[in-house]
Amino acid sequence: MNNLTKVLSSDFKFEDAIKVFGEKFPLTAKEFYSLQEEYKNKAFTVANYSNVKIIDEFQRVLLKAIEGGKTMQDFRSEMNSFLEDHGYKGLTNYRADVIFRTNIQTAYNVGHYKSMTSPAVKKLRPYWKYVAVDDGHTRPTHRAMNGKVFPADHSIWNTWYPPNGFRCRCQVVTLSKRQVEERGLKLEEEIPKVVEFQGVPFRLLPDRHFQTNPAKGLDAQVDISSLPDVLQRAYLRKTEKSKK
């Protein structure tokens, strides 16, 4: 069973993930990509739409899918009805899948991170292992991380926490000290800056725009006045909309 299936079929508690996704600020892609990496987990966007009202509808329909366990085809059907009613072309199956999968996976991993970092869990299972799907579709950098084990509080998880790219299928699992020892797993301290795949060197980084942990810093109280102007404007738009 892959991560996406787990999201839609398990009894995993998504209250935190739902709350976090619902509180994201809808932005145009231009606004979103102008943000520093540390602020992107507070925002939501979909490329190729300059009307924030369209992006707001994407967020609403995705949130409904996360809350209700809707399928990608449910999402695509509802969004295409809206888009076509507003003079836009409908989403192709591939594009709908990219948008749906990325956001569902992010919601799952935010919820999973909160579970893994609870004091009780960290005490019993203080190590985390990166797991990539090792097949012909796996990116070289993601494959290079496959099976690596680090302490749960290692800084690597500030960067290498999935999703680490569009259509990323990676996950992070927790391990007890006993499991690490019995399986003979190597406990990593550092990772190489460059890896080689089929004779080609790659910088060992997640994909562009996926180089921060989507769950980091979301519990902290945020002073809206300290946010970049584009997020402050989005906050005001969202506040005004909620009053209607």
Task: Describe every region a protein language model picked out.
Residues 1-165, 173-244:
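Domain-core detector
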